[in-house]
């Protein structure tokens, strides 16, 4: 049975956007001073973005966050490409209000270039966004995900959505929901993370649900 969601804003993950994102760790290194970063941001057609603190809006309209000062040419940085924002329903809210002022935050995401939205919607609409992104990943990498597992409440608020895991020789690529880590902590990103494999031990087997949850959390939580 579909699970209700207050609102969803999203922008399709394309091959070009994915290519640019996956190339960041091996791109020419850009110094982490403001002048050098501003120059690289302008050269790429990016902009600084306030929806997530210290983030960028790429030329494809997605929001890119990193745990370092620069995402350019830093192989050990963890980077996150946000292509969807979910405002989940809180089933514990007896009046089902859930802080309706958060609609305005989702509106800001929906106003980004190339983004669209739906309200109300369901977890199935969110899964459709993730499935489209997964097809792009499969087309780009030439193979499907190594692991597919439902998300847990420890990783993201809202209904359980699908996490998919790929690996390159150096990085883990995790596609799925993640906490927005914003000032309210209630919205959920739909994102692709690119993080060094060293963030967690070897990928657990498919039947080790608890181990996979810990492994994914080590890569997507920041």
Residue spans of the language-model regions?
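Short helix/turn-capping signatures at newly exposed starts of structured segments
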Residues: 1-151, 156-159, 179-222
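Active-site beta-strand termini and strand-to-loop segments that position acidic
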Residues: 165-170
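Short, isolated positions in well-ordered beta-strands
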Residues: 173-174
């Amino acid at each position: 049975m579909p699970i209700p969601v207050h609102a969803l804003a999203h922008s399709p993950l394309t091959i070009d956007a994915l290519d640019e994102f996956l190339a960041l760790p091996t791109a020419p290194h850009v110094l982490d001073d403001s002048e050098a970063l501003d120059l690289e941001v302008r050269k790429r057609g990016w902009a600084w973005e306030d929806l997530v603190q210290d983030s960028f809006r790429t030329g494809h309209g997605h929001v890119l966050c990193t745990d370092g000062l620069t995402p350019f040419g830093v192989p050990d940085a963890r980077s996150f490409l946000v292509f969807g924002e979910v405002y989940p329903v809180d089933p514990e809210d007896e009046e089902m209000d859930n802080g309706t002022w958060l609609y305005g935050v989702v509106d800001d995401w929906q106003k980004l270039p190339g983004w669209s939205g739906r309200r109300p919607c369901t977890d199935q609409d969110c899964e459709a966004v993730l499935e489209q992104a997964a097809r792009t990943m499969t087309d780009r990498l030439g193979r499907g995900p190594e692991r597919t597992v439902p998300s847990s409440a420890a990783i993201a608020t809202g209904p359980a959505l699908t996490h998919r895991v790929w690996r390159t020789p150096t990085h883990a690529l995790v596609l799925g929901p993640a906490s927005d880590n914003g000032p309210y902590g209630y919205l959920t990103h739909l994102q692709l993370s690119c993080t060094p494999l060293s963030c967690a031990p070897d990928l657990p087997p498919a039947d080790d649900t608890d181990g996979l949850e810990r492994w994914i959390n080590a890569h997507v939580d920041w």
